[in-house]
C-alpha cells in the first residue's frame, strides 16, 4: 500500500481518474458477483501491472468497508473480439485508460488467453488457452483447471498476512502429508496471499457426492447398509485413516498444547443453552458433561482443520484428499480449543473436534437425503439413516484409531474418545441450530 492509499500503476502513482475508474470497476464487480457493496466506499490499495499492452493485466487489491478484495483485471482493445470462458455473469466491468490508451476492463479469470498470461506471471509455465476451464467459484475464490494438469486458485477476498488455510496446506506438504493436491507455487504480494497453483486432481469425486450416492442406494434397496450397492463403509475406513494422518502431520508441523476438559464442558453448555436449553436437562446430556469434566487423562490440542466435514474432502483413484482447508484452523466453535492462541492468532483444538465435525456431517447427509426422497416421512427412512450412519461412524473410527501413533495424540481409551467426540458433536449441532435461527 502506498502512503496515500491510492495504489500504483506500473511503478507510478495512480492518477485521480484512474483511481476512480478502478474503484468503480471493483464496485461493479462486487455488485454482480455478490449483490453487495451498494454505496460502500472503495479504496484502491494496489494496482499492479502484470502484463503490458493488449491484452494486458492489472491486478487490483482494494479495501471495501472491512473487507480486502482482489480482482485481476484483463484489458483489451475496444471492439476487439474476445472469447470468454463460459459463465453465468458478463465479465466486462467498464473501461480503463493507461499508457496504451483506452481499454475494455473485464474479470481476467473469464478470459482463457489472459489466464494463461497470469499463470505465467505466477509460475512461469505455459498452457494451452483452449484447455482452460472454471471448476469452482465461491465468494472467496475462483479455481481454474489448466490442461487437467494444474489447478489455479485465485483468492477474491484477502486477509492481511498469511492465509490460515493456505498455511495449513503448506505445512502439511512440508512434513510429507500426501493427501493434498501438491502445491506448485504460491502467488503472494505485499504480505498477502493472492492465489495458489497446485496439481490437478484428475477424476476427483466430492466426498459429499459419494456419501449421498451411498445413502440413496440404501434408501432405494432397503436392508442392511453393508449389503447396499453403494456401501460407504470401506471408504469411511479409508477416510478415517487419512484424517488421523492429517492430524499427526499437523502435530508434527505445529506442535501441541494441553486442553482443559472442564472448560470444554462449559463451552458446550454455553453453546447449547441459547438455542436448545431443554437438551441440557436430558439425562444422557447431563451424564455426558459430567463425564467430560471428570476426564483426567491428557487431552492434547493441535492446529486442527477447524471445519472438517464431508464436503471438504474428495476421492480419486489414489485415495482420499483434503481439498478445502477453510477456515484454516480457526473454528467457529470453542469446545475443544486451547486457552491460549498461537502468536499468529491460530487456534489449537482437539483433533477429535475435527472427527466430530466429520461424523456430524455424515448424519446430516443421511437426514438430508431422507428428506429429499420422502418429504412427508411416510416411508420411515429414519431407521435406515441411523443404520447407515452407525456403520460409517464405526468404520471411520476403526480407520482413525488404527493409525500408528494416533494413540499418543488422542486419549488411548475408547470411552474417553466417545465422550469427547459426542460432546463436540453436541456443540456442532447447537452451532447449526444457531445458524438456522438467524
Per-region residue spans from a language model:
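Short Lys/Arg-enriched alpha/beta "domain-start" segment
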Residues: 2-46
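All-alpha amphipathic helical-bundle segments outside canonical DNA-binding/catalytic cores
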Residues: 234-236, 409-424
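Conserved ATP-binding subdomain of kinase catalytic cores across diverse folds
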Residues: 52-268, 318, 333-377
Amino acid at each position: 500500500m502506498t502512503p496515500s492509499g491510492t495504489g500504483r500503476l506500473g511503478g507510478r502513482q495512480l492518477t485521480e481518474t484512474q483511481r476512480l475508474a478502478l474503484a468503480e470497476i471493483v464496485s461493479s464487480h462486487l455488485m454482480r458477483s455478490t449483490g453487495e457493496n451498494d454505496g460502500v466506499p472503495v479504496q484502491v490499495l494496489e494496482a499492479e501491472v502484470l502484463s503490458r499492452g493488449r491484452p494486458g493485466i492489472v491486478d487490483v487489491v482494494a479495501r471495501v468497508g472491512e473487507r480486502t478484495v482482489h480482482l485481476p483485471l484483463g484489458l483489451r482493445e475496444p471492439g476487439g473480439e474476445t472469447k470468454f470462458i463460459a459463465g453465468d455473469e458478463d465479465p466486462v466491468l467498464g473501461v480503463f485508460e493507461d499508457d496504451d490508451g483506452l481499454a475494455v476492463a473485464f474479470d481476467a479469470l473469464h478470459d482463457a488467453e489472459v489466464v494463461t498470461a497470469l499463470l505465467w506471471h505466477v509460475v512461469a509455465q505455459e498452457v494451452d488457452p483452449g484447455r482452460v476451464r472454471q471448476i469452482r467459484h465461491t465468494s472467496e475464490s475462483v479455481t481454474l483447471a489448466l490442461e487437467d494438469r494444474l489447478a489455479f486458485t485465485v483468492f477474491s477476498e484477502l486477509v492481511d498476512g498469511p492465509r490460515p488455510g493456505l498455511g495449513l496446506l503448506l505445512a502439511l506438504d512440508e512434513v510429507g502429508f500426501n493427501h493434498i493436491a501438491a502445491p506448485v507455487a504460491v502467488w503472494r504480494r505485499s504480505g498477502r496471499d493472492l492465489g495458489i497453483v497446485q496439481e490437478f486432481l484428475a477424476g476427483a469425486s466430492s466426498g459429499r457426492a459419494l456419501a449421498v450416492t451411498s445413502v440413496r442406494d440404501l434408501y432405494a434397496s432397503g436392508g442392511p447398509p453393508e449389503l447396499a450397492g453403494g456401501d460407504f463403509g470401506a471408504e469411511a475406513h479409508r477416510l478415517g485413516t487419512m484424517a488421523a494422518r492429517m492430524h499427526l502431520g499437523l502435530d508434527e508441523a505445529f506442535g501441541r498444547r494441553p486442553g482443559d476438559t472442564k472448560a470444554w464442558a462449559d463451552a458446550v453448555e454455553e453453546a447449547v443453552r441459547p438455542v436448545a436449553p431443554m437438551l441440557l436437562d436430558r439425562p444422557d446430556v447431563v451424564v455426558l458433561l459430567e463425564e467430560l469434566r471428570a476426564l483426567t487423562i491428557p487431552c492434547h490440542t493441535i492446529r486442527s482443520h477447524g471445519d472438517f466435514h464431508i464436503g471438504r474432502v474428495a476421492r480419486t483413484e489414489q485415495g482420499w484428499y483434503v481439498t478445502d482447508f477453510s477456515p484454516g484452523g480457526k473454528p467457529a466453535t470453542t469446545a475443544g480449543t486451547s486457552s491460549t492462541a498461537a502468536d499468529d492468532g491460530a487456534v489449537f483444538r482437539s483433533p477429535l473436534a475435527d472427527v466430530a465435525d466429520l461424523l456430524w456431517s455424515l448424519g446430516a447427509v443421511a437426514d438430508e437425503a431422507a428428506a429429499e426422497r420422502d418429504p412427508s416421512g411416510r416411508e420411515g427412512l429414519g431407521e435406515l439413516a441411523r443404520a447407515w450412519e452407525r456403520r460409517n461412524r464405526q468404520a471411520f473410527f476403526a480407520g482413525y484409531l488404527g493409525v500408528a501413533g494416533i494413540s499418543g495424540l488422542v486419549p488411548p481409551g475408547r470411552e474417553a474418545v466417545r465422550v469427547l467426540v459426542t460432546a463436540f458433536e453436541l456443540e456442532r449441532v447447537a452451532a447449526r441450530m444457531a445458524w438456522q435461527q438467524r
